[in-house]
Amino acid sequence: FFDNKESSLLTSSKEVVSKLLVSSESSKDLFEANIAQDSMNEFKLLELMQGLDLGQIFKVYKAIDKSKQDGKKMIPRVLSDGHVIPKRGIKFSRKSFYNDVPVIFGTNRDETKLFNAIESDYSTSLFNRLIVVRNQEMYDLTAEYASNNWKISAVDNPSRDMINSGKKDVFAYRFDWDEQGKLLWMDFSKIFGAAHAMEIPFVTGTMKLLGIERFMFNDENLPDAIRLSIAMQSYWAEFAYTGDPGKGRDNNLPRWNTWSSSGEKFLILDSQNDQGIVMSDFELRRIDEFKRLFADSRIKKDDTKCKFLNNLVQNAYEKDAISFYNEKCLQGE
């Protein structure tokens, strides 16, 4: 529960159930509801939930969604339900928690720009075709923090956990290619950049992506893009053959090393027009990103920072990051 000493979320499943108990008049207040819920086994809880009116359930979630607009509360996206995700959560700290096979983790540098381009606080879509970015700096900032947050969950945390558990063959990458062309006022290198799914035509080698390739590739950038694609296919093929991408099938690429606790961690995949293919020793931690965001002078207002954090914490399970969010954004709630 949120008022326990151990950090929790104001809209955790237990908090929601307690609100439902009060809403259905099964308990007179949240304190009584918390006690009642703790005394229930899973079958009693199931019976209670199945007996609730649908309107009561929607009422609680609508109230949460309304306050979410103020950057105050949220519903977690990652649920340790014991079926899809183990009750222990997304953890790889022991070898018994995963299948011990060679693994590649990877994300794109600007993952969330694909979704932000469709609709966000700083952009809009006209006629489902034309994209208008109203504030490029804030648009980029939103993507920067959200994409880093994605990388923490999908790459850095599992890589660290597996390496710390004794696993050796953990590889990671970040796709950075962002050389798309322009159409009218739309600069797709800024609107999309290295967004979600942009790596697909490079991995497959088709240089096609549901028609989007018309705006991705042109006579100027295609030759270098193809060279990057050939390199990526070579790495992927070598990994499939041997479990180690190494220097690719022809042994002529920069070596893709495993994640190292004290050294290089992931491979940056970019064209020679930019930084090329190179290893990086940079890593991300959720609490550090949350603190960096709250100290970021580019974001002027604390309530805007809390709106950012509100979205980021929905994918967080680290207690220190959740505590930081609660302290900065939920005081007085």
Summary of predicted features, one role per range:
Residues 1-6, 19:
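Primarily recognizes the serine-hydrolase "nucleophile elbow" in alpha/beta-hydrolase
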Residues 32-226, 235, 242, 330-332:
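Substrate-gating cap/lid region and adjacent catalytic-acid/histidine neighborhood
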